[in-house]
Amino acid sequence: MRSGRRWCGRWLAVLIRDVEVERHGRVDVRVVAGRVAEVGARLGGSGGIDGRGGALLPGLHDHHVHLAALAAEAASVRVGPADVAGPEGLTQALRGGAPGEWVRAVGYHESVAGDLDRAILDRFVADRPVRVQHRSGELWLWNGAALRAAGLDDAGDGRFWRADERLRARTPPTPLDLAGVGRRAAARGITGFTNADPHPAPELRTLLRPLPQRLTILGLDRTAPVKIRLDDLTLPTATDLAARITRARPRPVAVHCVTRVQLFVTLLALDEAGSVSGDRVEHGAVIPTEAVDRLRMLGVTVVTQPHFLVERAAAYEKDVAADDRPHLYRCGTLRAAGVPVAAGTDAPYGTSDPWAVMRAAAGRVGPEGLTPRAALGLFLGAPLAPGGASRTVEPGARADLCLLHVPLREALDDLSANCVRAAFVNGRGISA
């Protein structure tokens, strides 16, 4: 595809011809200085990109992702239920590298080979350091060779819960394929990410600089929400959580809620501290019916992962309490009640393909299902206003754009990344 770029005075100008833009029909779009300058029929100017009638959308924004972990996947062994079967398959996967070299395995779930600890991993692999990450992202499992190599031989059973910061300095650096992450995201029409690590290192923004997408980093960016991660075993009282929320003000908060009790404590705390625009519940894995109106009254956005119901169906059937299953990863009923809803892939702990998330949301049966257009809208909110009004291709708008091969109606029939032709950030193409 020709770039269609030229210089207009000091500013880069891009003309995209014959594209379908919502509320405008088939038009031309001119971009100047990183923003949409004109939308109209047969705009003047030479050259340009021929859109061939494909839809031109605002670029997709993944509202919840863990970018460093996603970039580390290329140097990792996948050992989830879809990748290996049983202790034999796990052992074979872990033995794939050279003896003595560190093995970083990701995506593990107990359905593969049961609960793991140091002794069990040593029976599988003893001649090289092995660390296995649970698919929740919150638990690392190390064998004896890894513990000895890291100077942690006295670390008991080798199970480390939420200890990434402690462990990071004791392991060899993991190569990060940020170029690959950015390239694959661009091919799916993603022009922005919200990184949702609970404790981002101060140097994270510098680390992620190779990505061509626009970045929002929870906790680091002064205008972004502060991430608060809850755990049932160490759950604060509502009053203690309210005090923590108050300390974060005037910034909004993004509270990790994956259980019923975490959600109720969060709602009580927000009621006590007072909610502000931009407050978010991350995941909203279990939202009982009685909590929906409270979310609406507090004005809290839910950033959810409907694809987990597809990816983790067997585990949820086995592990989730029967009275919680009807309330998993709500979408449609939240929207119907006036609760803002957005989606994030939660990659690498879920698929990194937002179109797969859309298909999961649109494919649900009953009141939680969304129309394909509403499913697309899960990724069209502004970075700091997920679940709010969808961004639009209008004069003055930032030129973060997604060009499709086909009109929008056809794209909504498929909800597939195959429909994506190109992505632009500030009017500059970031994919071929």
Model-derived regions: residue spans:
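Extended hydrophobic/aromatic segments used for targeting, binding, or gating
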Residues: 207-226, 287, 293, 417
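His/Asp/Glu-enriched, well-ordered alpha-helical/loop segment
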Residues: 249-254, 263-279, 283-284, 289, ...
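Divalent metal-binding segments
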Residues: 9-209, 222-246, 252-258, 262, ...
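Short beta-strand segments
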Residues: 104-107, 217, 343-344, 403
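Active-site microenvironment of metallo-dependent hydrolases
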Residues: 2-42, 94-98, 174-187, 191-192, ...
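Glycine-centered helix-coil hinge/cap
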Residues: 40, 126, 219-221, 318-325
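Flexible loop/turn segments at secondary-structure boundaries
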Residues: 111-113, 139-140, 192-194, 200-204, ...
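Short, well-ordered coil/turn segments that N-cap beta-strands
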Residues: 101, 128, 190-191, 211-216, ...
